[in-house]
């Protein structure tokens, strides 16, 4: 009787552990931090157009080693979390990657972080300045991401962006 009870308890505990465990991929964060307000690309473009905020788009794959290495650095960065409030944040994994060539300006490597203006246009001039020049949108550290976010914020928000954008339309 006690052997059966012990086996039942062990089985129940294992089941409980299985259903309550998480691999850090719940929600739209997909390991990059569920505390950040992530959107789909479609919803993000609509929100950016309505709010005037630029978009930050992360393109990654679930099986990618470099992507897995970046996730905890990104998710644990308080500075990225704070800066994310100034962007519409989009997280695209696996088959969510757009087929549009604008989303792979210098190749289809992963992970890539791209910045889009509020109209949804990819801004290829915003690159990882401290990264490999052959992979301009590849970021390996939270510090690099923060620098990219600050540059994008400077270029894509406020009067400087509106003046440049308005002149482009004339």
Curated annotation (Swiss-Prot):
Glycans are attached at residue 128. A motif (Prevents secretion from ER) lies at residues 167-170. Gene3D superfamilies: Glutaredoxin. It is found in: Endoplasmic reticulum lumen. GO terms for biological process: negative regulation of endoplasmic reticulum stress-induced intrinsic apoptotic signaling pathway. Protein-disulfide reductase of the endoplasmic reticulum that promotes disulfide bond formation in client proteins through its thiol-disulfide oxidase activity. This is Thioredoxin domain-containing protein 12. It comes from Mus musculus (Mouse). The gene is Txndc12.
